[in-house]
Amino acid sequence: CMFYAFTNGTLIDEEFCKDMQRLGNISLALSVEGFEEVNDSRRGSGCFEKVMHAMDLLKEHGLIFGTSICYTSKNYKTVTSDEFLDMLIDKGVRYAWYFHYMPVGNEAATDLLLTPEQREYMYHRIREIRGFEANLCI
């Protein structure tokens, strides 16, 4: 039995990784929404650096982990670019969950919603990635 947990990764440290190794049946999906500038604009200053450090620790401890990516009208091409995917693979990411942005609440940013054309692009691009990226399950 395997358990998956979604996290921003900011509290992952050596002790946490050792606990994950001891348990042996948990995999984390770390939230990332692009490279540093875009990620930190949505998740807070310094989050990108913290999640990259968390990925390094998880990889060093031989733990299987992935990423959770919320794509928007602003980042959809970046988070499906070869450069971004190569970075994730180099960091040790083994799978990626892609979620389209859904505005929630009274002050949600509706400008981040994808257009029908952008959604179609994502539909085809994710299938293309699935066919070529042998080291990453999407």
Residue spans of the language-model regions?
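A C-terminal junction/extension of Radical SAM enzymes
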Residues: 101-138
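Radical SAM/AdoMet-radical enzyme domain recognition
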Residues: 1-100
